[in-house]
From Swiss-Prot:
Record bears the keyword Nucleotide-binding: no
Protein's UniProt keywords contain Coiled coil: yes
Coiled coil residues, start to end: 16-50
Organism: Homo sapiens
Stated name of the protein: Coiled-coil domain-containing protein 200
Biased composition regions of type Pro residues, renumbered to the chain: 83-94, 104-117
Disordered: annotated segments: 23-168
UniProt keyword terms in alphabetical order: Coiled coil
Bias (Low complexity): 70-82
Lineage: Eukaryota, Metazoa, Chordata, Craniata, Vertebrata
Annotated Basic and acidic residues bias: 31-52
Biased composition (Polar residues): 124-138, 145-168
Length: 168
């Protein structure tokens, strides 16, 4: 009888050791995966940071380089006109600089088409929504949005908590 007890205790101990060993391996694998993920995320962030400054620097650099080259090569009288055209497009949204800078044919041409199209688009939207509202109000099943069950014949019985409990 003593030997059976001994073997049973040894079997249990071996099972415990095996479980501990497996748990330790799983923890090590998880830690390695977490470290790999962290490293991968850091690499991605670093690569994004490397790409973003280049993009940010590359976009402003060509206009700056063009301005410097245009300022270095031409005379000072040409520098002022080259600086003025970039300053002219931002004032265009305001009405006063448009009248002063441009004779008037170019800015009014883009503005009149949006004005007629905007009221027509608004009218279309209001007509469309009124049609949708009429269609919604004419639907027989949606009398009150707060109703628990619309008046429709769907073929399914209304699910209630008592029905659900009774099914089990």
């Amino acid at each position: 009888m003593g030997s059976a007890y001994h073997w049973e205790a040894r079997r249990r101990q071996m099972a415990l050791d095996r479980r501990r060993w497996l748990m330790a391996q799983q923890q090590q694998e998880l830690q390695q995966k977490e470290q790999e993920l962290k490293n991968h995320q850091e690499e991605e962030q670093q690569s994004e940071e490397k790409l973003q400054p280049h993009k940010k620097l590359n976009v402003p650099q060509p206009p700056v380089a063009k301005l410097w080259t245009s300022q270095e090569q031409p005379q000072p009288s040409q520098q002022q006109p080259s600086v003025q055209p970039p300053s002219q497009p931002p004032p265009q949204p305001s009405t006063l600089p448009q009248a002063q800078v441009w004779p008037g044919p170019q800015p009014p041409q883009p503005q009149p088409p949006p004005q007629p199209t905007q009221p027509s688009a608004q009218a279309r939207c209001t007509q469309h929504t009124s049609k949708c509202n009429l269609q919604d109000s004419q639907r027989p099943g949606l009398m009150n949005p707060c109703q628990s069950s619309p008046i429709r014949n769907t073929g399914y019985s209304q699910l209630k908590s008592t029905n659900y409990i009774q099914q089990w």
